[in-house]
Amino acid sequence: MSSLAQASKPSAQRWGLGALIVLAILAVQASWLYFDGRIAMCECGTIKLWSGSLMTENSQHISDWYTLSHIIHGFLFYWLFTVIAPKAPLGLRLAAAVGIEAVWELVENSNFIIERYRANTSSVDYFGDSIVNSVADTVAALIGFLIAAKLPTKITVAIALFFEVLALIVIRDNLTLNVIMLLHPFEFIKQWQSGL
């Protein structure tokens, strides 16, 4: 066996282990949401690849305007693990990022957070994600992580800023406002968001 083949074998094994961990995390996430009473898919009876609706079908399909925020989560996790665990195999850093995103999805879909969104934002029609949407959000973070791993930091920062501005213009919401309104709501932001 050549030295190149021997050198690539541990790397492939780590990626394989990372992929298995990611699949296990996604399965646990979906199961947790199911047993917590979340609906599997949109009650409309279809699964759309994209839903631009901000009303009843929001967060019920595979992707929506908030998918942009989850891709940015992936960028942030890549940068975080590059700083705190730069020598860890990329596949394991990816699995850790997916684990954090999955935990966030479970928290985001808890009754406490759903009610907080409904009370403190313009999202009065938000009743939580479908399981399809929640798992797709985690996959979006995974994609964001992989994009950040491949592209120069300047490019991913530019993409993140573009996504934030685009969502702000189109739906008057984005990751930054979402965090602000979750942690310390401002009535003037809520009123502005309600003006759509």
UniProtKB/Swiss-Prot annotation:
Task: Tell me where it mainly resides.
Answer: membrane
- Transmembrane regions listed in the UniProt entry: 15-35, 65-85, 127-147, 151-171
InterPro entries per the UniProt record, alphabetical:
DUF2585 (IPR019691)
Keywords attached to this entry: Cell membrane, Membrane, Transmembrane, Transmembrane helix
The listed locations are: Cell membrane
How this chain sits in the membrane, per its record, is: Multi-pass membrane protein
User: Which GO CC annotations does the UniProt entry carry?
Assistant: plasma membrane
| Family the entry assigns | Belongs to the UPF0314 family.
NCBIfam families for the chain: PRK00944.1 (NF002099)
Which HAMAP family does the record associate with it? UPF0314 (MF_01514)
Q: What is this protein called?
A: UPF0314 protein Oant_0840
What organism does the record attribute this protein to? Brucella anthropi (strain ATCC 49188 / DSM 6882 / CCUG 24695 / JCM 21032 / LMG 3331 / NBRC 15819 / NCTC 12168 / Alc 37) (Ochrobactrum anthropi)
